[in-house]
Swiss-Prot record:
It is a multi-pass membrane protein. Translocates 4-amino-4-deoxy-L-arabinose-phosphoundecaprenol (alpha-L-Ara4N-phosphoundecaprenol) from the cytoplasmic to the periplasmic side of the inner membrane. The keyword Transmembrane helix applies. NCBIfam families: PRK02971.1-2 (NF002816). It comes from the Bacteria. One of its GO terms (cellular component) is plasma membrane. The chain crosses the membrane at residues 3-23, 36-56, 77-97, 101-121. This is Probable 4-amino-4-deoxy-L-arabinose-phosphoundecaprenol flippase subunit ArnF. Residues 24-35, 98-100 are periplasmic. It comes from Shigella flexneri. Keywords: Cell inner membrane, Cell membrane, Lipid A biosynthesis, Lipid biosynthesis, Lipid metabolism, Lipopolysaccharide biosynthesis, Membrane, Transmembrane, Transmembrane helix, Transport.
Length: 128
């Protein structure tokens, strides 16, 4: 069950990151503070997505807290790297996002997935 909480945390954090990225690209820049505040107070789609992203991070922290009660920190922390993979894939697949495929990024994803497999594969104890 602890791994399930960890996966929930990763998925929710990935969705939250995508939501915040969407909101940041559609809201006025914070350098124009009054325009930014006005957009937040209007509570349009962009502001609602920003709020959902922030709430998503809060929910992700709760799931992370539940994960750390049962799963070793070394494994739990490594699990968070899956978020990078999910966000990269989602940015290429979802309409409106401008994620680009590159061999460098694919190599990075392969390294992350290889590391996760090394950490999470069951080990066999050798008898001497």
């Amino acid at each position: 069950m602890c791994l399930i909480w960890g996966l929930f945390s990763v998925i929710i954090a990935s969705v939250a990151q995508l939501s915040l990225g969407f909101a940041a690209s559609h809201l006025p820049p914070m350098t124009h503070l009054w325009d930014f505040i006005a957009a937040l107070l209007a509570f349009g789609l962009d502001a609602r997505i920003l709020l959902l992203g922030l709430l998503g991070y809060l929910l992700s922290v709760f799931c992370w807290y539940k994960t750390l009660h049962k799963l070793a920190l070394s494994k739990a922390y490594a699990l968070l790297s899956m978020s990078y993979v999910l966000v990269w894939i989602a940015s290429m697949v979802l309409p409106g996002w401008e994620g680009t495929f590159s061999l460098k990024a694919l190599l990075g994803v392969a390294c992350i997935m290889s590391g996760l497999m090394l950490i999470f594969l069951p080990t066999t104890k050798q008898r001497y």
